[in-house]
């Protein structure tokens, strides 16, 4: 099965130019393709996952991906999908973001020791020294104003306003494609569905600049959720690929909590499971949704892919401990991950009567309530129910000398930090 057939099965093709010509080219030779990533933060988030994994899919199929980091365009701002003007970052900030993103991309693509190595490019290398006269004479003259105004990315902003800076973004991205076509023989650009206007503008520039040019564009669908909320966002904000911003446990939980209506679609979009494995999981969703086999597979595949096997095992262990209440077996680093958003209080490492600890840490509102909670068996210290009114929290209750986990009732956790 060819790469395009696999993408069709997975629902990963939104629009493409000259489908027949592209299919013939991909069957005939190892093709260079690119996708651009503008450095707007110091980490990629899961909204970037689909295009990153598309590059990986093409590489696994024998083609040569170019990961283009927009050190130049990142200083301008892409108006695509934006209702208002972006805040421009400083040159130093963009350079820092660029380096961070380059490091992350290297986790997904093979840059050496393979027959079809991926390459990394930074468009600042050719845009940074581009002078205004050359830009207007050699590139700008190929773009009719009516043509640009008709593009969705621009048309959608005409009423609210768009600066000349962002208006020019399409021309710069088009020049990227031309540059990569001329200097790297890059024949295909891929991107999100909101990039269709920019991609086709690039193809038009190549057509006008190069005789008998054969270049192609392909977009992937916008990832949606059945409940109408935005994919990749939670109450806590974006889901980042950087483990310092989103812990592997939080990352795993994001996928595990996928709606039954979306899980098969996400297995197709994001994982490298075979068609047969996905169809089997689809069957399990229909026959035994309560077992959440598809969600577990999705969570495992994605966490392993982004954070590695060890981080996945930790995430599963934390999830199981929180579900069962057996938290004493967790290490300090696992507690740090799993209890990141739990109310916590700093205390000195000294022996304290449990009743006093509950009140002083504001777990119970009063001593009377604290005594009642303990007597009624509502208080757990590191997962163990504690009903003795004179119980003293000592060194043995401090996990690795750093934490004591208090639970009140079935699910209300509190973290004591030392």
Swiss-Prot record:
EC numbers, comma separated: 6.1.1.1
Record keyword Cytoplasm present: yes
Binding sites annotated in the UniProt record for L-tyrosine: 34, 169, 173
Keyword Ligase: yes
Annotated binding of ATP, by residue: 233
GO CC terms in record: cytosol
A GO biological-process term: tyrosyl-tRNA aminoacylation
Location within or outside the cell: Cytoplasm
Motif ('HIGH' region): 39-48
Annotated motif 'KMSKS' region, positions: 230-234
Gene3D superfamilies named among the record's database cross-references: HUPs, RNA-binding S4 domain, Tyrosyl-Transfer RNA Synthetase
Chemical reaction(s) catalysed: tRNA(Tyr) + L-tyrosine + ATP = L-tyrosyl-tRNA(Tyr) + AMP + diphosphate + H(+)
Known function: Catalyzes the attachment of tyrosine to tRNA(Tyr) in a two-step reaction: tyrosine is first activated by ATP to form Tyr-AMP and then transferred to the acceptor end of tRNA(Tyr).
Protein name: Tyrosine--tRNA ligase 1
Organism: Bacillus cereus (strain ATCC 10987 / NRS 248)
Organism lineage string: Bacteria, Bacillati, Bacillota, Bacilli, Bacillales
